[in-house]
Amino acid sequence: MSNEIVLPNYKHCILNTITSILKYYNVETKHKSLESLDKLLEKKYKNVVFIVLDGMGEHILNNLSNNGYFFNKKIDCVTSVYPSTTTAALTTYYAGKPPYETGWIAWSQYFKEYGRAIDMLSHKESYKGEDIIKGASINVFDGVVKYTPIFEQIEKASPNVKAFEINPTYSDKRAKRSIRANNLDELIDSIETFVTHLLKTLYLLIQIIQMDYYINLELLLMKQKNLYMKQNIK
């Protein structure tokens, strides 16, 4: 794995990926789309299923089999945005805007309005998990860091399209039509349900899976195993 510092390329990053989706559904945006994805969407698909595997980047994919599905279906490689955190990246997909426009930059952010840190995806207080926003006089998610979700943008620009999302329970809902899925089995079942029962409906489905949790867990188990082996050798 290279130690080279990779800077965001805002002409070829995840922002351009979601911009292509917005462009496909006639949403006006000032950001540049991704040419490789634009070309793919020229086939005018009836349904678009957009799956985000959080944390499953290029270095991990490069260690998979050359005969595998991901390798054979690869059409491009883009950078993330800055900062390249889960919250910043996912909100780029949700808003169709970069972090420097939305203000969503970290998993936990301090707000002077509360004098507390808030987990951005769950809207809960970071240390005690309390819902301090409900009883507060101001909701920063309705003002300071508010954005228009792409689901709403798409349905406004293309009224014949129904936009859905499937996301984990820890994440706040951003679409009018939202289904929860906390593992791969639930994900696959949900996608199958959509495709089977909504074939007559044009829609956009965005799926968020926290793959980095499983990857980090595997790395932790490997480190513990290596430490155990070293201790036994001594």
Descriptions of predicted regions:
Residues 213-234:
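A long, amphipathic alpha-helix that forms part
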Residues 1-32, 65-74, 81-219:
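His/Asp/Glu-rich, glycine-adjacent segments
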Residues 55-59:
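Short acidic, Gly/Ser-rich segments with clustered Asp/Glu that frequently serve as metal-coordination loops
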Residues 60-64:
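Short, solvent-exposed loop/turn and secondary-structure capping segments
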